[in-house]
Amino acid sequence: MHSRGRQWNAYETFLLQNASQITSLESSLRSITYFLPGRFKDAELAGEAIYALVHLLSLYHDSVLFRIVYSHGTRDAKVANVLAGANIPKLSLHARYTSYWCAVSKRYGYAARALMLIEATQLLAEMVARRKLNKQRAWDAVIAIEVVKAFLRFTLVRTTQDRPVISPPLPQREFDPAQLERNPAALPMTWRGERTGCIRRSLASMAGRDAYEQLLSFTLTEQDVSAPPLLVRAFQNNMARFAESVWILRPCIYVILLRIYGARDPRPFTTSFVVELLARTLRTNALVPRGKSASNLPPPPTTSISLWLSVLGIENSFLDWLASSLSVQPRHPSLKPVSAVEGEEWTARKRSLWWYLLRGPVWYRWTRPKIAHFVTRTEHRRIIGFFGSIAKEYLPLIDEYYYYAAV
């Protein structure tokens, strides 16, 4: 056991000392997998296997780097020496929130790791299932994956005391690994407080501009001093809980309908899209104080577009509606996210609607013909034709595999 512990300590030290090179290698391997489909038989399976393996290794490296870099103490002298010469970045709000729940709830940590493990390997599992099983059994495997993911997401909601799921649920590698590869022998760039164990950057290692930026980094906002649970609001009513439940169950509903009706039938696509919009509408209405509804809220503040229309003497209800829709200001203060963590999650869920361009009738009748037409027109051009040939190889993959177009 002691020898195994020493081996892990040695690997962690190696990871810290070569973090930049390891990150570059991971990025290169991922890039290679994008060009593999269509190059040889089962190339997409080989490429996805490499991609999944690199993704899992990256998840492990992220956890190691986060645990070592942001811990107040370290058990290994070599690791401490590496960190003594590094410029430790500030902990992000997302990392504060997710690391807090990992620390206070083991169940959250297990569920979050299991969810990210499944998401890293789900496409590979689907490829294997479609090669080994018949069509209906392969769809059963996909349904099983989505049911397990839904269960894990409900577990995250429960362990965070009725808060929405934040993606990704674990801290990420949010700093440049090259920052960990400074030479401490040349100039000590940080010092560690003996009483608190906190790492601070040395003033002697800073230029004038660096010192100014370092002082700015210590400027605290309301979100910086808030307790991690306050970065995401808990559900205030049953409508909010139902909205999150609908959002979590949305992929399960879609996959079950795909198994019954097929990908070309409009019913799975329409149902999934309506459920997505229903979840968003319920969430918005749940945030509005009781006695009001989102449809009865006062209009948002006048935008610059509305002002220009008034100056030009143009009165048009459609243009006024369009200007109001383009406004990024919320129609009620409660609709504004309480932190960047909550706001980024809302934005990510809004962007997920773009994936419907790769699904169902929209994919087969509009998006796919457009891409195929582009590939045909550019196949004899040198640079554009190269990228067109890559896109051509992905068309049958999106037709066959669900997880190529899944959120």
Positions of predicted regions on the chain:
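N-terminal signal-anchor/initial transmembrane insertion module
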Residues: M1-K106, Y110, L117, I384-V407
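Fungal eukaryote-biased detector of long internal structured cores
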Residues: I50-L53, L57-L230
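Helix-turn/linker elements and helix-coil junctions of extended alpha-helical scaffolds
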Residues: Y60-I68, K132, T159, I260, ...
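Membrane-lumen (extracellular) interface motif
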Residues: F35-A46, A125-A141, I256-T271, V288-A294, ...
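Transmembrane alpha-helices of multi-pass eukaryotic membrane proteins
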Residues: A19-T23, K41-V54, A111-A112, Q136-K149, ...
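Hydrophobic, structured segments
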Residues: V157-L358
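C-terminal transmembrane module of eukaryotic multi-pass membrane proteins
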Residues: N316-V407
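Membrane-embedded alpha-helical transmembrane segments of multi-pass integral membrane proteins
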Residues: E26-L29, T33, V54-V64, L115-A125, ...
